[in-house]
Structure formats: structure tokens, C-alpha cells
Amino acid sequence: MTIPDVPTQTLPDEGEIGFVHIGSLTTEAGAVIDDVHIAVQRWGELSPTRDNVVVVLHALTGDSHVTGPAGPGHPTGGWWDEMVGPGAPIDTDRWCAVATNVLGGCRGSTGPSSRTRDGKPWGSRFPRISIRDQVEADIAALAALGIDEVAAVVGGSMGGARALEWIVGHPSRVRAGLLLAVGARATADQIGTQCTQIAAIKSDPNWQGGDYHDTGRTPDAGLAIARRFAHLTYRGEVELDTRFGNDAQLDEDPANSGRYAVQSYLEYQGVKLVERFDAGSYVVLTEALNSHDVGRARGGVRKALRSCPVPVVVGGITSDRLYPLRLQQELAEQLPGCAELQVVDSICGHDGFLVESEAVGEMIRKTLLLAGSQSAGPGGAGPGSRKGTTRR
């Protein structure tokens, strides 16, 4: 994606991509990323008091295109189409939905495939970043747009990790949050599976130490294998067995070099990602997920969570293998502003936060009720003092 010479410093037209220049960013680890741009989209009108912004935060391979058809700059349709629009859970007749492409991504924001001032891609020079760094970049982009406080942050998976960092690190900037399919820190299981995905990419000869962007050779095979592995953690075990079992793929015979149906499905998922995503961004963002720990430098997870007054709804999925329900239960128990833990009974696994539209829509509506009940700041537990668990 080409960034225009003059970046947008006002919100773009509805559904269009704008590019906000935030200057240099110093990461949590002390590295400096110069000339940072953040891609932004919005739906709905900003109120005169600028108090109706709902920040929608995407997952690992998502982008700012939350809703709308595929088109120029949008290789795929919106990833949460049913959640944003007139009359939708994020009702754009009332709310202004704003989404960024995350720092380190490859859909308009500065990342490994972006060119530096020397005209060359960042490649291996792009530093490791954290979820916290991503949030700092988002906050800087919104500040450049004249938005210093938001009504709510909502997100699942990596987007949920970003939402958690928002409410813990910047409670005065956000009135409510929705934390979907996420935990307070990365688990050993997550780190193990994600390190294996990174290894698959880096073992591809075309990786070239991360400096492949101008060579005409890209680590597509490694990225596709990483995606296949990841996709297994995104879907539910019962769902996969119900859909595919041990069936062969159409007229192929696995006993004679043919494929299983589930094998073909995973290969297709890998090919789809390679067509739209950069391997360098996949590595950088996965490393950020591995380092996720809301308690780092805050006295540990419990202390960090207990210090956060922001009203929240926490959502989990019964069949989530990547972020199992116990992680959302911990968030609900430790966050004093948690109004409700909503548990979605679904066979779809971690991806339930993307496909269980009715249940997720209800969570968003409840989150925005919390946002609407707050004044200029979180100001205590408020509605969050009434904790409960709802199963859907």
C-alpha cells in the first residue's frame, strides 16, 4: 500500500483509509522507529464534543477495514461487518467507530515492509515491539486527530490484548472496554505454538534474514505453514471433526499420496493469507503477542488488573483452545470494573469472537451502555460493581 506524501491529520471520509503521521516512536524496549504512519478508517460522524468514538481493535492478521466490501486498499471485505453500521451493535447513527491498522502491520501502518527515509524497506531493521507499543501508537494517532478520550475500546484476540492495555495503561482516556477471547498475559501454550509458527517462516530460504522485500523472493511457503498451524488453534476440535472427520479430499486417496479434507482446508487457509499478508509483519506481531503481559513493570498481573477502574465486559468462548475460558475468568475476577463475564457456548473455537455475531453483538451493546453511563472519565466501578456470568 502506498502512503501519500501528505498524511491525513483529520478523520478520513467514511470507510476510506487515511494515514496519520505521528513522528518518531520510542518502544517499550528503547528502540526508536522514525517517521511512523498509522492507517485509520472510520464509520459514523464525530460528535461536536468528540466524545462518541469507539475504537475497534483488530486481531493478528486483521486490519482497519472492519466493515464494507473489498476494493482498492481492501483485499478482503470487512472482518466484523455485522458489528458496525446504522442500527448495528456499534450504531453509527450514535457512535463514531474508528479502527487503525496496528503498528507493525502491513495494511498502511509502519511495519517491516514500509520504506524508511533511506528508501529501503525496514525489513530486519524493524525492532521488536510490544502490545503496549501498539497502543501508544494508536493513542498518538488519535491525539493527532484531536481525540484525547474515547467512549470505548473493543477487540478480540490480539485486539483484546490491545484493549486491555488501553484500559490498564490509560484509564483516563477510555470510558469502557470489551475484552474478548484474551488473557492477561501470554501462556506457555500460546508462546510455544506461536514460536513454532515463527520458526516455520524463518526456516524458509526466501526469508533471507528478514530482508527479502526487494529481492523478488518472499517466504510464502513458510508463511503458509505458519498460518496452517495457527488456524488449528483458531478453530474448535469438535467443529473440525464434525466438518471433516478423517475424510479424504474429494476423490483423493491419502493412502496413495492424496490429501485429507482437513489438510486441503488448512492449505487453502495458508494460500489465502499469503495473498494478502506480509511474513515480516506476521513475525513482528506474533512476537508482540508472545511478550503480552499486562503486569510487566506494574507489579504483576493481579496488581495491574486490580488497579484498573474502567468498566468492562469480558467475553469468552467455551471451545477456545488458544485463549481458554480460564483466562477470561481471571480477568473478570480481578478487574474491579467488570460488569459481566459473558460465556459463548460455541463449537467454533477462538474464532467464535468473529463468527458468533448475535452473542458478540450483545456484548458490544452492553459495553456501550457502560460507556454511555460514564461521565468524562471512568470515575469508579459504577455499573461494573454488579458482576455476573452469562452463558449464551
Swiss-Prot record:
Keyword Transferase: yes
AB hydrolase-1 domain sequence ranges: 52-356
GO cellular component, one term: cytoplasm
EC number: 2.3.1.31
Chemical reaction(s) catalysed: L-homoserine + acetyl-CoA = O-acetyl-L-homoserine + CoA
Pfam families in the cross-refs: Abhydrolase_1
Localization, UniProt: Cytoplasm
Amino-acid positions noted as binding substrate in the UniProt annotation, renumbered to this chain: R227, D351
Region (Disordered): 373-392
Subunit-level organization: Homodimer.
Family as reported in the entry's similarity comment: Belongs to the AB hydrolase superfamily. MetX family.
Protein name as annotated: Homoserine O-acetyltransferase
Species, as recorded: Mycolicibacterium paratuberculosis (strain ATCC BAA-968 / K-10)
Phylogenetic placement of the source organism: Bacteria, Bacillati, Actinomycetota, Actinomycetes, Mycobacteriales
